[in-house]
Design a protein with these regions (language model features):
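Glycine-rich phosphate/ribose-binding loops and adjacent secondary-structure elements
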Residues: 75-78, 84-95, 99-131
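Non-catalytic, usually N-terminal nucleic-acid engagement modules in DNA/RNA processing proteins
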Residues: 1-98
Length: 131
């Protein structure tokens, strides 16, 4: 079973969200209440679902998006990936974790920009230490 991080779902709430370094604040489309989702929250939800593969929390940008915005998004997504790795390692060390062998996959972002697509691929492969 593969679970998604919620990044695309947050993207789909563009008019209701506010992206920050710590994560994303958004208003429920159902009742308007404020909700926060960050890398750690995403990992905890996916761990509780006991999927085989969990996806790292990422920022999905519109197509097309300006280069600078996309670059900042790629850098934030890489930082979020590192936080996902840290949280997954912590969760997998707990006695009550259901699936201690859950795998974490990074998501390749970068919009339409080849250099950014290559950069995040390199970050995912070499800098994140995926479990």
């Amino acid at each position: 079973i593969l679970t998604d991080s919620g990044g695309f779902q947050v993207f789909s709430l563009a008019k209701l969200r506010n992206i920050k370094e710590e994560g994303v604040y958004f208003n429920s489309h159902i009742d308007g209440r404020k909700i926060f989702m960050g890398p750690e929250e995403s990992m905890r939800i996916q761990s509780n679902l006991a999927s085989t593969i969990a996806m790292a929390f990422d920022e999905c940008v519109e197509n097309p998006s300006p280069y600078e915005y996309t670059k900042n998004s790629v850098e934030r997504t890489t930082r979020w990936l590192k936080r996902c790795v840290t949280e997954m390692k912590r969760l997998n060390s707990l006695d009550d974790t259901i699936n201690k062998n859950q795998m974490l996959f990074g998501i390749n972002q970068g919009g339409i920009y080849d250099d950014l697509l290559r950069k995040i691929k390199s970050d995912i492969l070499w800098e994140s230490e995926l479990p």
